Regions:
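P-loop NTPase Walker
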Residues: 1-115
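Coupling/switch/interface segments within P-loop NTPase motor domains and analogous charged loops
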Residues: 117-127
C-alpha cells in the first residue's frame, strides 16, 4: 500500500490537472462524460489503481465497473490488472450489464419460486 500523496498515475502517464483530481477524489462520486477516444477507460483504470493501491478501497471491499460492451469490460479489467497487479485487480469486477444481471440471477435462482422459478440449466432467450 502507498500513501495517498505518494500515488502517481501508473505507466508514467501524466494526467491533466482535472483528471488527476478526479482520479484521487476520496469523498465524492463522480460522473465522467466525454466523446470516443477521450480517455475515459484509462481514467477509470487509473482511478481504480489509486483506490486499490492507496488502500482507499480497503479490503475486503471491491470495485464494480459496468459497461455496455464485452470488449470495453474486458479492456478495463486488463488495464487495471496491468496497473496495480493481479492481487489487487482481483478486487476489481468489470462486467457488461447483461453479465452482471446474469450473475445476480444465478446467485439467487435457488430462491426463485412459483412462476419466477428457473431450471438449473436455464437459457436466456434472444429477442
Amino acid at each position: 500500500m502507498i500513501a495517498v500523496d505518494a500515488w502517481k498515475p501508473a505507466d508514467g502517464l501524466t494526467l491533466e490537472p482535472n483528471a488527476l483530481r478526479a482520479a484521487k477524489e476520496r469523498e465524492l462520486s463522480l460522473a465522467l462524460t466525454a466523446g470516443p477516444g477521450a480517455g475515459k477507460t484509462e481514467m477509470l483504470a487509473q482511478r481504480a489503481d489509486f483506490l486499490l493501491r492507496t488502500g482507499t478501497c480497503r479490503y475486503p471491499k471491491r470495485i464494480l465497473a459496468i459497461s455496455f460492451k464485452v470488449d470495453a469490460s474486458s479492456n478495463l479489467k486488463e488495464r487495471v490488472k496491468r496497473r496495480c497487479g493481479s492481487e489487487l485487480a482481483s478486487r476489481f469486477d468489470s462486467y457488461t450489464f447483461h453479465a452482471f444481471a446474469k450473475r445476480i440471477i444465478d446467485r439467487f435462482r435457488p430462491v426463485l419460486t412459483g412462476e419466477y422459478a428457473l431450471d438449473v440449466g436455464y437459457k436466456i432467450a434472444d429477442r
